[in-house]
């Protein structure tokens, strides 16, 4: 699952990547291929040079035809540069404007890692005019693969089944499962999920869509509310279906076996699906406008994916069939009413079918207001904030990345609201729920800005969230470009600077469920770092030599390092100088 930052990086890199691909085609096996970009400069002498080698680990084997990307943090002042490694793995980029850059390397079938062979997302370089940075080493290692075959109870191939490779992440202070990769089986029942980093995963297979069952369910006669012959869970006709199955062979995610993948692994995971008694969810949609209907969707709270659905019958009843045990959110969306409406309800399916779920859709809310920016002249940025380049984002308080599981109330709702030049903004058709407001965008205030206050009816709601339950909510939002700054150097136990260390400002415990309160950066080749836009408050600074992904969002992970962090108190506009000792990574 790509983050917003990854998507932004992709869009930024697209022109450069296309140019590099053309260069590869033209240069073939030449020793060094170079493509440069960025703004024009009158004197080449003021430009920097970067060169190094790309190797495959273990063994330090040279990697040819790797795409090297050098991306400026500040696109207004720097540029984007690319090169392609030669047969000896070497690369050379020249004509680089001064600034702070991120350096990445990509090659099909390989992933970038640090010296401890933990997945890395590039490194940071700070380049001065005329500086030459040489002897860089970018390490790649083989990606892992999960492959296998899915068959039915007779051993026949099961085509179009969805196989997912899952990993555990933490969002909003709670565990969440996300897809690291997924593929559908082919006509032979075979699948192959590639490009996986070393780590711990779980593998699941979901049967192909049962369109026949869905059509039959939608066309079934509704049962009357006073029908005493209606089936109860113990009286329901015996039905069987294929269920989502976890490796090696269980429908209970809690009993799934973890799969530990190492670099270059080709792990075989075969499945044989057998029909088993299926559970269902029955209920009704009430209080609908005349002639309105609703679509029912079942969203997994573990995976934040819509897994199943049903159509509402004429009397408002619905049946969702073939439900596996688990934690869900059930959604009812009404889109053919004069005003979009929605209902959502959390439920747990254990060992029996669920009856009598009652959903009462409500109209979406209207959240609007005005954003103003304080301290523009005092901030660290290079000019006034361009309000039209600012976005505000609603994120549900319960930690769901997608409050609607990928579905919306018609065309009127989006999580993101663009701020107009006069500071006004609005969200239309907001589903019922409680939301945090987040700041995003590329205003001229730079990276030192932060969200200072969110008022609803004169009351501060930044900590509790904004409630939406139909009707209008007016917000007065204040941002500041005068966020705190923490800068310094990361050193090892011998006092030597450490490059590419991951520095994270972790907020106090009560705010750790809100990932936007964290601040993260990476030290450059001299061990220097700067954390920008820190909201006033209490923090703990950590510097890891190597850290797996975003493990620092996991409260259990942080418990292991409680005594190795440095306390930081920062006020608005304060600039703190800190010296951090790196937390060593595990030995190779």
Segments and roles (model prediction):
Residues 1-14:
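N-terminal secretory signal peptides that target proteins for export/translocation
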Residues 2-5, 21-22, 26-588:
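Long luminal/extracellular ectodomains of secretory-pathway precursor proteins
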């Amino acid at each position: 699952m790509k983050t917003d930052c990854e998507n932004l990086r992709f869009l930024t890199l697209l022109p450069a990547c296309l140019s590099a691909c053309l260069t590869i085609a033209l240069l073939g096996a030449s020793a060094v291929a170079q493509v440069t970009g960025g703004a024009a400069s009158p004197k080449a002498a003021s430009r920097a040079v970067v060169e190094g080698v790309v190797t495959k680990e273990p063994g330090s084997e040279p990697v040819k035809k790797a795409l090297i990307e050098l991306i400026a943090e500040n696109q207004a002042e720097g540029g984007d540069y690319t090169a392609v490694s030669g047969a000896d793995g070497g690369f050379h980029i020249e004509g680089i404007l001064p600034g702070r850059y991120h350096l990445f390397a990509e090659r099909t079938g390989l992933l970038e890692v640090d010296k401890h062979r933990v997945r890395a997302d590039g490194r940071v370089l700070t380049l001065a005019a005329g500086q030459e940075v040489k002897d860089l080493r970018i390490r790649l290692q083989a990606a892992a693969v999960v492959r296998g075959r899915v068959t039915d109870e007779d051993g026949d191939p099961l085509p179009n089944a969805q196989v997912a490779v899952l990993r555990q992440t933490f969002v909003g202070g709670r565990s969440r499962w996300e897809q690291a990769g997924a593929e559908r089986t082919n006509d032979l029942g075979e699948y192959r999920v590639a490009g996986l980093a070393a780590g711990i995963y779980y593998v699941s297979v979901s049967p192909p869509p049962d369109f026949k069952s869905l059509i039959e369910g939608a066309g079934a006669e509704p049962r009357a509310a006073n029908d005493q012959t209606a089936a109860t869970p113990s009286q329901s006709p015996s039905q069987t279906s294929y269920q989502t199955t976890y490796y090696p062979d269980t429908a209970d995610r809690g009993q799934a076996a973890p799969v530990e993948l190492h670099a270059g692994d080709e792990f075989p995971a075969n499945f044989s699906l057998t029909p088993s008694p299926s559970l269902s969810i029955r209920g009704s949609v009430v209080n609908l406008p005349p002639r309105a209907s609703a679509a029912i969707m079942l969203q997994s709270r573990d995976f934040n994916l819509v897994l199943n659905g049903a159509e509402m019958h004429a009397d408002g009843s619905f049946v969702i069939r073939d439900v596996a045990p688990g934690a869900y959110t059930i959604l009812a969306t009404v889109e053919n009413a004069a005003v979009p409406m929605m209902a959502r309800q959390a439920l747990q399916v254990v060992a029996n079918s669920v009856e009598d779920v009652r959903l009462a859709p409500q109209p979406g809310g209207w959240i609007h207001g005005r954003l103003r920016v304080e301290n523009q002249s005092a901030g660290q940025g290079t000019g006034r904030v361009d309000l039209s380049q600012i976005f505000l984002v609603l994120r549900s308080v319960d930690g769901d990345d997608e409050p609607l599981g990928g579905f919306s109330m018609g065309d009127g709702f989006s999580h993101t609201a663009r701020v107009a030049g006069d500071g006004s903004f609005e969200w239309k058709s907001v589903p019922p729920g409680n939301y945090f407001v987040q700041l995003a965008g590329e205003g001229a205030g730079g990276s030192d800005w932060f969200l200072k206050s969110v008022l609803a009816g004169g009351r501060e709601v930044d900590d509790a969230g904004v409630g939406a339950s139909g009707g209008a909510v007016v917000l007065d939002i204040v941002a500041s470009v005068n966020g705190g700054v923490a800068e310094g150097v990361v050193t090892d136990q011998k006092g030597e600077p450490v490059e590419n260390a991951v520095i994270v400002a972790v907020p106090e415990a009560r705010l750790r469920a809100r990932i936007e309160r964290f601040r993260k950066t990476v030290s450059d080749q001299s061990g220097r770092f700067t954390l920008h836009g820190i909201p006033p408050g209490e923090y703990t600074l950590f510097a890891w030599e190597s850290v797996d992904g975003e493990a620092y969002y996991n409260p259990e992970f942080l418990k292991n390092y409680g005594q190795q962090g440095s306390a930081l108190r920062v006020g608005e506009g304060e600039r703190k100088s800190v010296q951090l000792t790196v937390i060593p990574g595990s030995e190779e």
